[in-house]
């Protein structure tokens, strides 16, 4: 992989300057998702990167994991501040995911580890005597209208904004991107015809993400208590 430094359209081609040299191409596919910044153009105002993390427990053993998750399925809740978890493929650990919006670039911090430890204890109170061996994270691309962006403009093809469903969506959206190149036409998907919402206060929103996260947790705690 190499880092994109800049790109510009010259006649019928795009010239890309990267950390490894220059590239000249007729079509430019932008699939930056949660890592969309100013260098992709004004479209970066359509999307924001939200931190997403996964933690892996120590080896608990198949018997204990089976007791904690009897059907060995993937579980997810329906809250705004949601969690999801599942057994590892060998059924010896538990993998636990969350969106701690305050935790930009803090995979190895004690705060993130403590956060996961507390949440796993709350959701799986019978787990007892466990530790967290690994934590990794990145950014989920969330659009302001919560729909993926799939469009072609001046031979620049945008495929981004999966809102946390990238594993399921991106193979198909990648097919759509390739199809736009081979047919030299825009996608016929309904979402490609919907106007994407821009938010020019994006950078202020990023600063206030921790506050928004706290608001949703507070709101859901009240709902759980009184509804």
Question: At which residue positions do the language-model features occur?
Answer:
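A conserved short coil-to-beta-strand element within the FAD-binding core of flavoproteins
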Residues: 1-14
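Short secondary-structure boundary segments
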Residues: 2, 32, 185
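Active-site substrate-recognition segment that forms the wall
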Residues: 6, 22-154
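A generic structural signal for beta-strand entry/edge sites
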Residues: 11-15, 91-93, 156
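Residue-level detector of beta-strand face positions
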Residues: 15-17, 149
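C-terminal catalytic lobe of FAD-dependent flavoproteins
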Residues: 102-109, 114-221
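A hydrophobic C-terminal alpha-helical subdomain
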Residues: 225-227
């Amino acid at each position: 992989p190499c880092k994109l430094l800049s790109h510009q359209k010259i006649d019928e081609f795009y010239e890309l300057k990267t950390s490894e040299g220059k590239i000249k191409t007729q079509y430019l596919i932008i699939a930056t998702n949660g890592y969309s910044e100013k260098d992709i153009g004004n479209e970066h105002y359509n999307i924001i990167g939200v931190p997403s993390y996964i933690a892996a427990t120590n080896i608990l053993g198949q018997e204990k994991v089976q007791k904690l998750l009897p059907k060995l399925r993937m579980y997810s809740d329906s809250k705004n501040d949601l969690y999801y978890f599942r057994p590892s493929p060998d059924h010896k650990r538990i993998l636990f995911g969350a969106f701690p919006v305050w935790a930009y670039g803090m995979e190895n911090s004690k705060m993130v580890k403590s956060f996961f430890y507390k949440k796993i204890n709350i959701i799986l109170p019978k787990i007892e005597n466990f530790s967290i061996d690994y934590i990794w994270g990145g950014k989920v691309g969330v659009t302001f209208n919560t729909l993926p962006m799939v469009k072609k403009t001046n031979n620049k093809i945008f495929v981004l904004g999966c809102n946390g469903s990238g594993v399921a969506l991106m193979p198909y959206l990648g097919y759509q991107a390739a199809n736009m190149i081979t047919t030299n036409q825009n996608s016929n998907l309904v979402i490609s015809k919907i106007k994407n919402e821009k938010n020019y206060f994006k950078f202020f929103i990023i600063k206030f993400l921790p506050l928004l996260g706290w608001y949703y947790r507070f709101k859901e705690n009240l709902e759980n208590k009184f509804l």
